[in-house]
C-alpha cells in the first residue's frame, strides 16, 4: 500500500554525551577535542533526510546545525523507512542548476553523499533511533525489499495514483517537526522564532516542492522525485526540460531562516541565473561539438583505470553514471569525479564537462587539439588525471589539524580543501592572518568570514577561481588581500563595496586576465599598495588616480600603450613599476607632479623621452633599460640607482650633478665616451658598467670617483687607460676584457683594495709594475709618470726590491701577446689565488715560479707552447685547478703535493702518453684522490698502462665526476655514462661522416654535473646524427636526477615518434615536437611513481604498467618537480638539419663568406614578450624553489602551465656553404657574443675539438661561473664530392696554424691592433694581376656630420666594423680608407660582389643610433611587400675589374694600387646612389661568363665556392646605359647589381624614373636564388636505393616503369585502393629527388627556381591519384632536362 514517508520529531533535543557518528576518524577527532576548553561542541544531526538537500543534491552538513535568522539552530530530524509515496502531477520537486561554488561538507564528503548514507541507513526496517553509530550499510543489502518502484515505467503508472493522499500525509509530516535547543557562540544571534517554521520550513531548502504545470511533459523526471523514489538522480537532471520553469510558490515557506554558506546551500530565489564571476575552465565550458568523440581515461582508488570513448560534451554526472555501469555498481550517488594535477585536486561539478576541461589542459601542455592522436593517447597521467572515488577528501586534512595547533597566523594552503575545516571555526574570531591559497575547490563561506572579526591578512591566491565579493565584504579589519593567479577576467564589484573597503591597505591582483577594474575600486580610500602586474590592461584605469593614499603601483607585464595624464593626482605615490608594457614616445609631463616618487621602473618599453622625471625631487631609483632613449640631458640629484642599459644613448649631459649616485649602468649603448664634467659629479658611485659602447679611452677625470668599487668596461674598442685609475683607493673589481689595450698603467697595481683584474682579449705585450722608493714607500702618480718618461729601462732591469707587491687575488690575462718575460713581473703577485695566462705566447715557465705562490689554487695556461710545467717534485704546490690543454706536454709533473690537492685537471690536446704522477708508475692513478674533473681528449698517443684497470674510475678515481676521453686511440671501458656519478665524454663508437668537438667546464663553486651532451651517430638512418646539449637549473648539493632521466630517455622518445612519421620535413618537425612532449609526460610518470613508492613502499606492477614506466627507478623526490632541463638539439638527416629547443640553450650556424652567424633557436625566458603573454593567457607563473627565468623546459612540472615543454622547431636545408653548427648552454651564451664564437671557431676550423676547448676557455676568462658546455658540429662531410677539397683546405689551415705558432713573434707583429680582428682569419695577401677593385662612400655623410655629429661618431664605428669583418670573412684586402670611404680589392669578381651584397644586407639590420634612423637621410623605407629597403646609413658602391699597378706604401706598410682601373672605379661609384652597387661593363662580362667552359676550367676550389654562394644569394643586373665619366675620354657602360632580397630597390628606382617618362626602360637580367640545399644528388639516391624495391600490383607479372605512366589514362577508382607502387616514404623520396634535380640544374646553370610546392607528399589513395602524381613528377624532371639542354645549346 502507498504510504508517505514519516518525518518524526526527535525525542532528545541534544545528542547523548558519548554520541558516536559511525565515522571513525570523525569520532576520534571529537574525542581529542573533549579536553579542549576553548572548543565549541556542535550538535550532530541524527539523520539527514535525502530530500532535505540543496539544489545540487548536497545534503546538510552533519557537523554543524542550521542557524536561522533569529540565531537559534534548527533541530535535527529523523525519518523511518516506509513504502515510498508517489507524488501527484500537481507537485514538482524543482531542481535548479547547481551552484558553481561547489563545496564539501565539514566531514570531507559532499552533502549529497551524507544524505545518501543517511537514507540508506534509514531504509532498514524498524531500526532503533540510537543505532545510528553502526555506520552506513551497503545499499545492495536491502535495495530489493525497500524500493517500491525501481523503473521509470512504474513511476509513470503510479504518478497519477493517490495524489491527494500524498499531499495530505506529507504536509502532516512537516507539521510535526521540532528542533533542539540552540548551541551557538554567535554573539550577534537573536531569539529564534519557533512558530516561523510551522508548515513552511522545507521551502527554505533548495530542493523545495513546487506545483507542476498541468500541461507538463512526463518524459522528464524531476531529480528530487527520482531521489526519493530510489532512482538514479543523475538521469536527465541537468538537461531536463524541468529546469526551464521558474519557481512556483512552495507548499511550505519561511523567509526568516537561511542556511549558512558553509553548508553550500542557498535560497531558491538566489538560484535564479544571474551574473557569474568565475574562471574560464572551472565554470561552464562551452559545449563545443558534442558529437566529437573523446578518449577518456579514468582511474580508481586502487590505481586501476578504465578507458572509453565518449562525446566530448559529456557532463560529469553522465560520466559518473557510465562509470557506475562499467564497474557494475548498484548506484552512482556516492561517487565523485576528481580532477588531480600533481598535489592539487578538485571535485568536478555535475554540470561541468570533463572532456573539454581535459582537452584544454592537454593543449596547455603542448598537445595539438586538432590531432586526435595527441589528445586521445593514454599516457596523460602526468598532465592530469580523473579519479572515480568515494573517499573522504577532507579526512587527511582534518587529521592533520587534530595534531596541529591553530595559531593566529593560520596557513592551510595546498590542502585540497573543499570547505573550511570544522576545527577552525572556534578559533575564527582569533585569526589575524589566513592563507588558503592553492585550494582549487575552496570557496570561503559567508558565515565563517563573519566570525573572522580580527582578520587582517587574507591570501586566496592560486585557487584558479574568481572570489565572491560577499564573504570578503564581511571582513571589517582586512588590511591585506592577495587574489593573484586566480584566472579572473572581471572582479566582483562587491569585493570593494563592503565593510573592508575602509581598512584595506594592500591589494594583489597580479597574474590574472583583467582588462579593467570595477567602479567600486574608488572606495578603497586607504589603499597604499596595488599590484596589477601580469594582466591584460590596455589602457590606464582612471579609477586608480582617485586612490589618493596609494604609495606602490605595479603595472608591469601588461599592454599599456600610454600613461594617463591624471597620474599626477597620486601625490603620495612612492614606487611605480611599468616594465614590459607597450609605452612609447615621451612620458607625460604630469609624472613630474609625483613629488614623493622614489622608484620607477620603465624597462622594456619604447620610451624616447623621460624629461618629466627630472621634476621628481625624491626619485632615487631609475630603471629605463631596453628603451629607445637617445639622449639624457636632465638630472635627478637624489638618484642612487640608474640603469640605462640597452638604450641607444649617444649623449649624457645632465644639468646637475649625480652626487648621490651609487649604481650606474649604461651598457650596450652608443656612447663614444662620457664628458669629464659628468664623471666629476659621480663622487659617490660604487658600481659603473659601460660595456659594449664605443669608448676609446678611460678619461683622467675618473679619479673623481673616489668610492668606486666595481668598474666594467668590456667590448668597447678601448685603447687607452688613464693612470689616474690608480687613485681609486676603494676599487675592488676591474674588468676591461675584449678591448685594444696595449699598455696597462702600472699605477693601477698599487691600489691596495684591488682583488680582481680581468684584462683578457687585449693586445698586452708586457706587464709593468710600480716602483717603490728605497724606504719601501710607494711613489706618487706624478713621480711614476716622470720615471716612465725619462727611463726607458724595462722592468726586468730594475732591482727587485724596488717593486710594490700587488694585492690582486684573481688575475685574468687570456688572449694577449705576452711572452716568457711576463713571469718576472708576475713573481711579485704574492696574493694570487687565480691566475689565467691561456692563449698567449709562453714557451716555458720558470722552475722557481711556483715556489713563491703559497695561496695559488687555480692555474690556467691553456693554448700556449709549453713543453713542460717545470714543477719540481719537492715544491709545495697546492693547486686545485690546473688547465694546461692545447700545449706540447709529453709528461705530467711528478709532484706528490700537487697530485693530492688537484680537483680539476685538463691536459687535453697535448702529447701525453700516460698519466704518471709519481716516479713509480705503478698505480699512479691512486695519487689523485680528490680529482673530480679529468680531460684527456686529443692526446692521440695516450695509452693506459697494462696494470691499470679499464674501469679505473671506480677503482682509483672514486671522486671523479667528469671524464673526457675524446679522440683517444686506446681501448676503454664501454660502461655507460652516469650523469649522477661519473659522466664520460667520448666519441661514439659508430663511424660518422660528420666530425664534432665537445668540451665542458665543471664549476669550481658548484661541482655538480648540470650540463651534458648527447651524441648519437647513425640515429635511425645511416646518414643521420643527433647532437644535443642538456642544461639543468640545479642548485648546490643536489644530484640532478631529472637531468639523468632526460639523458637516458631523450633518444628513445624521439626515435619512437620519428619512426612513426614519414621522411617529409613537416612530419619530422612534428615528430620532434611530439618527442619532447612524450619525454615530459614520461618524466611526470616517473616522479609520481617514485613519490608514491617512497610514501607507500612497494607499488604494484599494475601501477607501473598503467603509467608506462620502466622499473628502473631514479629515486626522485618532491624537489624534482621544481627542476627543469633546457635542451637544444640538432638532428642532421641527409642534407637537412632539424633544430629543436626548449629553454635557454641556443644554437647558431656559420656560413662561408658571411661574417654574421644564423641563429637557429629561440630563447624561452621571461624576457621574451611572446612567452610572457603565453604565461598570462594560460594563468601560469614562473617561481618556485629554483629561481630560474626559463619559461620552457623538460620538467618543472610544479609550474605547469607556466612552464611547458613545447619546443621551437625549424629545418635548415644545408649546402656546401654551411660550415658548422655550434650548440651551447645558457651560461656560455651569457658571457660570449655570437661574433666572438664564430671568429674563434673559424680560426680553428681544422679541429672541432680544439675549437670547442678554446671556446670553453674563453667563457671561463670572460666570467663564467656555472657549468659550461659547447658542441661544434662540422658540416663539410655531408657533401662527398667536395670532401677531398675540404680536407685539403683543412690540412692547409692546420699547417698554417702550426707555422704561425712556430714563428710566433713575427706573427704577433703582423697582427692588427684590434683584438676582435686578430681573432678572425688572417688577412689575405694583396691581390695581384687582374683584380676586382671596389670603392664605397656614404651618401649624405657631410650633412649627417653637421646635424648629428655625436651620433655619427657611433654610426661610423658600426659602419667600419661591418666593412672590416665582412672583408675577413670574404677574403678581401683593405687598401686604405679616406674619411668614411673604403678602397678594397678582391682577386675575383664573385668575391667582390659577395662582399658588396653582404655589406648592403647587414647595413639594414645594424644597430644604428636613433638620431640616424629618425633622420630623413636614414629613415626606414619599406617595399611593396613590407620588406626593409633602406634603414640607417646608405652606402654607394662601385666595382670595376682589370689589371692594376701595385706598390707597397713605406709609411703604412700596406699595398697601394694605381692605374686606369683604379681611376675608373672611383668614377663608377659616383654614378651609384645610396644603397646601389654600380658595376662596369667588365664586371658584367665576367658575370655572363661564369658558366662557360673556359671559366669552369679556370675555377679553383675557392672560386667555385664563391660562384655557388653568389648564385645561392641570387642577383639582378639592371643596365643603366652609357655615361660620360669625369676625366675619361670614352663613355662607360654602367649597370646596377642588386641581391634578390633587395629587388624592391630596383622596383622603386624603375617606378620613380617611369613617372612622366614614356620611353622604354633599359633591359634587366635576373638571376633568381636557388634553394639552400645540397647540390649533390648522392644522398637522395642513396636513400632511394636503401628503400625497398618497387613492386607491382598484386597479381601483376612485373614492375612498372615510371615513365610509362605518362600515357596511361587516369580513371577514377570506385573501390578502395589496396596498394601503391611505393609506400609513403618512397613517395617522399621521389618528391625530394625532383626538387634536388631542379636545384642542381639551377646552381650549375643559373636557371630560375620552379614555383614552390607542398612540403609533404603522402601516398595516393586510389589509382587515379597515383597516375596523376607520377605524371606531375615525370613532367617536372623532363622540363628540367629540357631547360638545361636549351641553356647548353643542345637542340632536338
Swiss-Prot record:
Disulfide bonding pattern of the chain: none
Extent of Polar residues compositional bias: 1600-1614
LRR repeats: 430-450, 454-474, 477-498, 503-524, 526-547, 549-570, 572-594, 596-617, 618-639, 660-681, 684-705, 707-729, 730-751, 753-774, 783-805, 807-827, 831-852, 855-876, 878-899, 901-922, 930-951
Domain Guanylate cyclase: 1332-1469
Segments of this protein annotated with the region Disordered: 1-22, 103-142, 1585-1614
Major subcellular location class: cytoplasm
Gene3D superfamilies with a match to the protein in the record: Nucleotide cyclase, PPM-type phosphatase domain, Ribonuclease Inhibitor
EC number: 4.6.1.1
Self-association state and partner proteins as the record states: Interacts (via N-terminus) with gpa2; the interaction is direct and serves to activate adenylate cyclase and cAMP-PKA signaling, to repress sexual development and gluconeogenesis. Interacts with git1.
Protein known as: Adenylate cyclase
Organism: Schizosaccharomyces pombe (strain 972 / ATCC 24843)
Taxonomic path: Eukaryota, Fungi, Dikarya, Ascomycota, Taphrinomycotina
Amino acid at each position: 500500500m502507498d504510504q508517505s514517508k514519516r518525518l518524526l520529531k526527535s525525542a532528545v533535543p541534544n545528542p547523548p554525551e558519548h554520541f558516536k557518528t559511525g565515522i571513525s576518524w570523525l569520532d576520534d577527532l571529537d574525542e581529542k577535542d573533549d579536553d579542549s576548553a576553548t572548543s565549541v561542541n556542535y550538535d550532530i544531526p541524527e539523520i539527514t533526510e535525502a530530500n532535505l538537500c540543496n539544489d545540487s543534491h548536497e545534503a546538510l552538513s552533519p557537523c554543524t546545525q542550521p542557524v536561522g535568522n533569529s540565531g537559534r539552530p534548527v533541530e535535527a530530524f529523523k525519518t523511518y523507512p516506509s513504502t515510498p509515496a508517489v507524488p501527484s502531477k500537481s507537485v514538482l520537486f524543482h531542481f535548479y542548476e547547481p551552484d558553481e561554488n561547489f563545496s564539501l561538507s565539514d566531514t570531507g564528503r559532499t552533502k549529497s553523499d551524507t544524505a545518501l548514507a543517511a537514507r540508506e541507513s534509514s531504509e532498514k526496517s524498524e531500526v532503533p533511533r540510537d543505532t545510528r553509530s553502526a555506520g552506513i550499510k551497503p545499499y545492495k543489502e536491502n535495495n530489493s525489499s525497500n524500493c517500491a518502484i525501481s523503473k521509470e515505467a512504474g513511476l509513470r503508472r503510479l504518478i497519477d495514483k493517490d495524489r491527494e493522499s500524498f499531499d495530505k500525509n506529507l504536509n502532516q509530516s512537516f507539521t510535526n517537526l521540532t528542533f533542539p535547543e540552540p548551541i551557538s557562540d554567535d554573539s550577534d544571534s537573536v531569539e529564534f522564532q519557533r512558530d516561523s517554521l510551522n508548515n513552511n520550513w522545507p521551502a527554505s531548502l533548495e530542493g523545495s516542492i513546487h506545483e507542476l504545470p498541468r500541461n507538463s511533459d512526463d518524459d522528464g523526471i524531476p531529480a528530487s522525485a527520482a531521489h526519493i523514489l530510489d532512482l538514479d538522480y543523475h538521469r536527465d537532471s541537468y538537461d531536463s526540460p524541468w529546469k526551464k520553469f521558474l519557481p512556483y510558490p512552495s507548499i511550505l515557506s519561511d523567509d526568516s531562516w537561511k542556511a549558512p554558506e558553509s553548508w553550500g546551500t542557498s535560497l531558491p530565489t538566489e538560484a535564479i541565473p544571474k551574473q557569474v564571476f568565475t574562471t574560464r575552465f572551472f565554470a561552464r565550458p562551452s559545449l563545443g561539438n558534442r558529437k566529437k568523440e573523446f578518449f577518456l581515461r579514468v582511474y580508481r582508488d586502487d590505481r586501476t583505470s578504465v578507458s572509453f570513448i565518449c562525446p566530448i560534451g559529456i557532463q560529469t554526472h553522465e560520466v559518473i553514471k557510465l562509470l557506475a555501469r562499467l564497474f557494475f555498481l548498484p548506484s552512482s550517488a556516492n561517487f565523485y569525479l576528481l580532477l588531480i594535477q600533481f598535489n592539487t585536486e578538485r571535485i568536478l561539478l555535475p554540470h561541468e564537462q570533463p572532456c573539454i576541461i581535459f582537452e584544454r589542459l592537454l593543449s596547455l601542455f603542448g598537445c595539438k587539439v586538432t590531432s586526435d592522436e595527441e589528445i586521445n593517447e593514454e599516457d596523460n597521467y602526468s598532465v592530469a588525471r580523473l579519479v572515480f572515488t568515494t573517499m573522504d577528501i577532507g579526512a587527511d586534512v582534518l587529521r592533520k589539524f587534530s595534531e596541529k595547533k591553530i595559531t593566529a597566523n593560520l596557513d592551510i594552503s595546498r590542502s585540497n580543501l573543499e570547505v573550511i575545516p570544522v576545527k577552525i571555526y572556534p578559533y575564527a574570531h582569533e585569526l589575524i592572518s589566513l592563507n588558503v591559497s592553492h585550494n582549487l575547490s575552496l570557496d570561503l563561506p559567508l558565515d565563517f568570514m563573519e566570525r573572522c572579526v580580527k582578520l587582517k591578512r587574507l591570501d586566496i591566491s592560486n585557487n584558479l577561481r574568481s572570489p565572491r565579493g560577499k564573504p570578503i565584504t564581511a571582513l571589517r579589519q582586512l588590511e591585506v588581500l592577495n587574489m593573484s593567479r586566480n584566472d579572473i577576467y572581471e572582479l566582483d564589484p562587491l569585493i570593494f563595496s563592503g565593510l573592508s573597503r575602509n581598512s584595506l591597505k594592500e591589494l594583489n591582483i597580479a597574474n590574472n586576465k583583467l582588462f579593467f577594474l570595477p567602479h567600486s575600486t574608488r572606495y578603497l580610500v586607504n589603499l597604499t599598495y596595488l599590484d596589477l602586474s601580469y594582466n591584460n590592461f590596455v589602457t590606464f584605469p582612471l579609477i586608480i588616480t582617485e586612490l589618493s593614499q596609494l604609495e606602490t603601483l605595479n603595472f608591469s607585464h601588461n599592454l599599456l600603450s600610454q600613461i594617463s595624464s591624471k597620474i599626477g593626482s597620486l601625490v603620495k605615490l612612492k614606487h611605480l613599476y611599468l616594465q614590459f608594457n607597450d609605452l612609447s614616445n615621451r612620458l607625460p609631463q604630469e609624472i613630474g607632479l609625483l613629488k614623493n616618487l622614489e622608484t620607477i621602473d620603465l624597462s622594456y618599453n619604447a620610451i624616447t623621452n623621460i624629461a618629466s622625471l627630472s621634476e621628481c625631487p625624491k626619485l632615487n631609483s631609475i630603471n629605463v633599460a631596453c628603451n629607445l632613449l637617445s639622449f639624457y640631458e636632465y638630472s635627478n640629484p637624489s638618484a642612487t640607482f640608474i640603469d640605462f642599459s640597452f638604450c641607444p644613448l649617444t649623449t649624457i649631459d645632465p644639468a646637475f650633478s649625480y652626487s648621490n649616485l651609487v649604481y650606474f649602468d649604461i651598457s650596450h649603448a652608443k656612447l663614444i665616451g662620457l664628458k669629464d664634467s659628468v664623471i666629476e659629479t659621480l663622487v659617490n658611485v660604487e658600481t659603473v658598467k659601460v660595456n659594449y659602447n664605443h669608448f676609446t679611452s678611460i678619461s683622467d677625470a675618473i679619479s673623481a670617483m673616489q668610492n668606486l668599487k666595481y668598474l666594467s668596461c668590456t667590448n668597447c674598442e678601448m685603447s687607452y687607460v688613464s693612470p689616474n685609475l690608480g687613485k681609486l683607493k676603494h676599487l675592488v673589481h676591474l674588468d676591461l676584457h675584449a678591448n685594444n689595450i696595449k699598455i696597462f698603467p702600472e699605477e693601477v697595481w698599487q691600489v691596495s683594495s684591488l682583488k680582481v683584474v680581468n684584462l683578457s682579449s687585449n693586445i698586452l705585450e708586457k706587464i709593468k709594475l710600480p716602483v717603490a722608493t728605497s724606504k719601501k714607500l710607494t711613489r706618487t702618480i706624478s713621480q711614476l709618470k716622470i720615471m716612465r718618461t725619462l727611463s726607458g729601462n724595462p722592468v726586468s732591469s730594475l732591482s727587485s726590491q724596488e717593486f710594490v707587491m700587488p694585492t690582486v687575488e684573481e688575475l685574468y690575462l687570456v688572449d694577449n701577446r705576452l711572452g716568457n718575460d711576463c713571469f718576472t713581473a708576475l713573481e711579485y703577485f704574492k696574493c694570487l689565488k687565480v691566475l689565467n695566462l691561456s692563449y698567449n705566447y709562453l714557451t716555458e715557465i720558470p722552475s722557481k715560479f711556483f715556489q713563491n705562490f703559497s695561496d695559488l689554487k687555480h692555474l690556467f695556461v691553456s693554448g700556449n707552447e709549453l713543453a713542460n710545467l717545470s714543477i719540481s717534485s719537492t715544491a709545495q704546490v697546492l693547486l686545485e685547478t690546473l688547465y694546461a690543454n692545447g700545449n706540447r706536454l709529453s709528461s705530467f709533473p711528478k709532484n706528490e703535493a700537487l697530485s693530492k690537492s688537484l680537483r680539476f685537471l685538463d691536459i687535453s690536446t697535448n702529447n701525453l702518453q700516460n698519466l704518471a704522477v709519481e716516479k713509480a708508475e705503478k698505480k699512479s692513478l691512486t695519487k689523485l684522490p680528490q680529482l673530480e674533473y679529468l680531460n684527456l681528449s686529443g692526446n692521440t698517443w695516450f695509452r693506459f698502462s697494462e696494470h691499470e684497470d679499464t674501469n679505473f674510475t671506480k677503482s682509483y678515481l672514486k671522486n671523479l665526476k667528469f671524464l673526457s676521453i675524446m679522440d683517444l686511440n686506446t681501448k676503454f671501458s664501454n660502461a655507460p655514462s652516469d650523469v649522477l656519478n661519473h659522466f664520460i665524454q667520448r666519441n661514439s663508437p659508430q663511424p660518422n661522416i660528420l666530425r664534432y668537438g665537445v668540451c665542458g667546464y665543471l664549476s669550481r663553486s658548484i661541482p655538480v654535473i648540470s650540463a651534458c651532451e648527447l651524441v648519437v651517430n647513425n640515429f635511425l638512418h645511416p646518414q643521420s646524427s643527433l647532437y644535443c646539449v642538456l642544461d639543468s637549473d640545479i642548485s648546490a648539493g643536489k644530484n640532478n636526477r631529472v637531468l639523468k632521466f632526460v639523458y637516458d630517455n631523450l633518444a628513445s622518445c624521439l626515435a619512437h615518434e620519428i619512426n612513426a612519421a614519414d621522411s617529409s620535413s613537416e612530419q619530422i618537425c612534428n615528430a620532434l615536437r611530439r618527442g619532447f612532449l612524450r619525454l615530459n609526460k614520461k618524466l611526470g610518470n616517473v616522479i609520481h611513481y617514485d613519490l608514491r613508492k617512497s610514501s607507500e613502499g612497494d607499488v604494484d606492477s599494475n601501477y607501473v604498467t598503467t603509467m608506462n614506466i620502466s622499473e628502473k627507478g631514479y629515486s626522485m623526490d618532491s624537489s624534482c618537480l621544481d627542476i627543469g632541463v633546457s635542451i637544444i638539439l640538432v638532428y642532421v638527416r641527409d642534407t637537412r638539419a632539424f633544430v629543436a629547443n626548449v629553454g635557454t640553450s641556443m644554437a647558431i650556424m656559420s656560413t662561408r663568406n658571411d661574417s654574421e652567424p644564423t641563429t637557429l633557436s629561440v630563447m624561452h625566458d621571461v624576457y621574451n614578450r611572446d612567452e610572457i603573454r603565453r604565461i598570462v593567457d594560460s594563468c601560469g607563473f614562473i617561481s618556485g624553489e629554483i629561481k630560474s627565468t626559463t619559461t620552457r623546459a623538460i620538467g618543472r612540472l610544479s609550474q605547469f602551465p607556466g612552464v611547458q615543454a613545447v619546443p621551437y622547431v625549424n629545418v635548415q636545408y644545408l649546402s656546401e656553404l654551411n660550415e658548422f653548427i655550434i650548440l651551447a648552454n645558457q651560461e656560455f651564451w651569457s658571457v660570449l657574443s655570437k661574433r666572438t664564437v664564430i671568429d674563434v671557431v673559424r680560426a680553428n676550423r681544422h679541429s672541432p675539438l680544439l675549437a670547442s676547448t678554446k671556446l670553453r676557455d674563453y667563457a671561463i676568462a670572460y666570467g663564467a661561473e656555472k657549468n659550461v658546455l659547447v658542441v661544434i658540429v662540422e658540416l663539410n662531410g655531408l657533401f662527398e664530392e667536395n670532401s677531398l677539397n675540404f680536407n685539403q683546405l683543412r690540412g692547409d689551415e692546420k699547417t698554417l696554424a702550426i707555422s704561425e705558432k712556430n714563428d710566433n713573434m713575427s706573427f704577433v707583429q703582423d697582427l692588427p691592433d684590434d683584438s676582435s680582428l686578430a681573432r678572425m682569419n688572417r688577412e689575405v695577401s694583396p691581390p695581384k694581376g687582374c683584380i676586382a677593385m671596389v670603392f664605397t662612400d656614404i651618401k649624405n655623410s657631410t650633412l649627417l656630420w653637421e646635424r648629428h655629429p655625436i651620433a655619427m661618431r657611433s654610426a661610423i664605428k658600426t659602419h667600419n666594423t661591418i666593412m672590416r669583418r665582412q672583408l675577413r670573412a670574404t677574403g678581401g684586402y683593405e687598401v686604405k680608407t679616406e674619411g668614411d670611404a673604403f678602397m678594397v680589392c678582391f682577386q675575383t669578381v664573385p668575391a667582390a660582389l659577395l662582399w658588396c651584397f653582404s655589406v648592403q644586407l647587414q647595413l639594414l639590420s645594424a644597430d644604428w643610433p636613433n638620431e640616424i634612423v629618425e633622420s630623413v637621410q636614414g629613415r626606414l623605407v619599406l617595399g611593396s611587400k613590407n620588406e626593409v629597403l633602406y634603414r640607417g646609413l646608405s652606402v654607394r658602391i662601385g666595382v670595376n675589374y682589370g689589371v692594376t699597378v701595385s706598390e707597397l706604401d713605406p709609411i703604412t706598410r700596406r699595398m697601394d694600387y694605381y692605374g686606369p682601373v683604379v681611376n675608373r672605379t672611383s668614377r663608377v661609384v659616383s654614378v651609384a646612389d645610396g644603397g646601389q652597387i654600380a658595376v662596369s661593363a667588365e664586371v658584367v662580362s665576367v658575370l655572363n661568363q661564369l658558366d662557360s667552359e673556359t671559366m669552369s676550367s679556370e675555377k679553383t676550389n675557392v672560386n667555385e665556392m664563391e660562384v655557388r654562394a653568389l648564385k645561392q644569394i641570387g642577383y639582378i643586373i639592371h643596365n643603366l646605359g652609357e655615361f660620360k665619366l669625369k676625366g675619361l675620354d670614352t663613355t662607360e657602360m654602367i649597370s646596377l647589381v642588386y641581391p634578390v632580397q633587395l629587388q624592391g630597390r630596383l622596383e622603386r628606382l624603375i617606378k620613380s624614373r617611369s613617372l612622366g617618362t614614356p620611353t622604354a626602360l633599359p633591359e634587366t637580367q635576373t638571376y633568381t636564388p636557388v634553394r639552400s640545399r645540397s647540390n649533390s644528388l648522392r644522398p637522395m639516391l642513396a636513400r632511394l636505393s636503401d628503400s625497398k624495391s618497387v613492386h607491382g600490383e598484386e597479381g601483376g607479372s612485373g614492375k612498372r616503369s615510371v615513365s610509362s605512366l605518362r600515357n596511361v589514362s587516369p580513371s577514377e577508382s570506385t573501390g578502395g585502393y589496396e596498394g601503391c607502387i611505393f609506400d609513403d616514404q618512397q613517395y617522399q623520396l621521389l618528391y625530394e629527388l625532383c626538387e634536388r634535380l631542379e636545384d642542381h640544374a639551377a646552381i650549375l646553370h643559373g636557371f630560375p627556381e620552379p614555383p614552390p610546392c607542398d612540403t609533404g607528399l603522402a601516398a595516393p589513395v586510389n589509382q587515379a591519384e597515383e597516375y596523376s602524381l607520377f605524371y606531375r613528377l615525370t613532367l617536372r624532371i623532363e622540363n628540367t632536362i629540357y631547360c638545361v639542354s636549351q641553356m647548353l645549346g643542345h637542340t632536338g
